[in-house]
Amino acid sequence: VHVDAVARYLYHIREGGMAMRYGVAIAKGNLYEPGTYTIKVKKKWPTWTPTPAMIEREPYKYAQYEEGMNAGPSNPLGSRALYLFDGNRDTFLRIHGSPSPKSIGGRASSGCVRMVMAHINGLYDQVTVGATAHLHPTEDTITASA
C-alpha cells in the first residue's frame, strides 16, 4: 500500500504488479506522518477514541468522546480500519473509511488516511495483516522505477 500525499491517492499494488488507485484525504497541516508502517490489525466496524493529543488540541470537538464512540455510520473510522504499527508500537494512525466523503482529496484528518466507505471495504478484503503501508512525504511524488 502506497499513499501519495501530494496527489491524495492510495495505491494498492497487487500480485503481478497490477495497482488499484483510490482517492484519499490525509492529515491536516503538520499532523501527517510519512513513513513505512506495518498493518498489524484490521477491524470491521471499529470503535473510536480520540487520542489525548486530539483532545488537548481541540477539546470542544473531542472531549465528549474521551470514553470512545461505538461503531456505526457516524463513527469517524467508518466501516473498516487498517491499524498502522511501527514495529510493535501502535502509531494510532489508521487507513479507514469516512462518514465525510466530501473530505476526500483534501487535508482533513488528525493523522489518518481517509477513504470513502466502498473503497475501504474493498481494500480491507484485499490487504492482509502484515502488509506494508508507505505514507510518502507531502513534498514528494511517487515515480515508477524500472
Residue ranges of predicted features:
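N-terminal targeting pre-sequences for secretion and organelle import
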Residues: V113-A146
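A short pocket-lining beta-strand/turn micro-motif at the edge of beta-sheets
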Residues: G78-R80, T91, A108-G111, H119, ...
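Short loop/turn segments at secondary-structure transitions that flank enzyme active sites
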Residues: N30, W45, P101, E139-T141
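Gly/Pro-biased beta-strand-loop elements
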Residues: V1-R94, Y124, A146
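Short leucine-rich amphipathic alpha-helices used at interfaces
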Residues: D90-T91, G97-S98, L135, T141-I142
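Immediate flanking context of iron-sulfur cluster ligation sites
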Residues: I95-R107
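Short, loop-centered acidic/histidine patches that primarily coordinate divalent metals
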Residues: F85-G87, S98-S100, A118, T138
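A short beta-strand motif that forms part of the nucleic acid-binding face
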Residues: I26, G97-P99, V127, E139
